[in-house]
Regions:
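Extreme N-terminal cap/leader segments of soluble proteins
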Residues: 1-60, 79, 88, 105-110, ...
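A glycine-rich phosphate/pyrophosphate-binding beta-strand-loop-alpha-helix module
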Residues: 62, 66-116
């Protein structure tokens, strides 16, 4: 089985050849990357959660949202940073609008809990 580290190595050349590579203080690793943006350090993290790997399909949408966000927050904490905002990417075959409404509610509740 291919490891996450092996896959990340396939993309390292993109960082190495970036026009802005001097702004990349710490390249993307398992947790996050540190980027210098006009004198401020920005820690950027992207996570993917997958049904059957990170959560079971029987979980409530609110709980999936909570788990997804708190996992990302843990990565940021591991880098010694504090969250300012989140960005969400979602792919799904679920065709019930109520599922997305509940997922959205779970996101809002989690963001409120952590004052984001």
């Amino acid at each position: 089985m291919i490891s996450e580290s092996d896959i990340l190595k396939c993309f390292q050349h993109l960082v190495d050849s970036s026009y802005h590579k001097d702004s990349i203080l710490l390249g993307s690793g398992d947790d996050a990357a540190v980027i210098d943006t006009q004198g401020r350090k920005l820690v950027h993290s992207v996570d993917i959660s997958r049904i059957g790997v990170h959560f079971h399909e029987s979980m409530r949408p609110e709980d999936i949202a909570y788990r997804s966000i708190t996992t990302a927050l843990s990565d940021l904490a591991g880098m010694g940073s504090f969250p300012s905002f989140i960005s969400i990417g979602l792919t799904s075959d679920i065709e019930e609008i109520s599922w997305y409404e509940k997922f959205s509610k779970g996101i809002k509740e989690t963001l409120d809990e952590f004052s984001i």
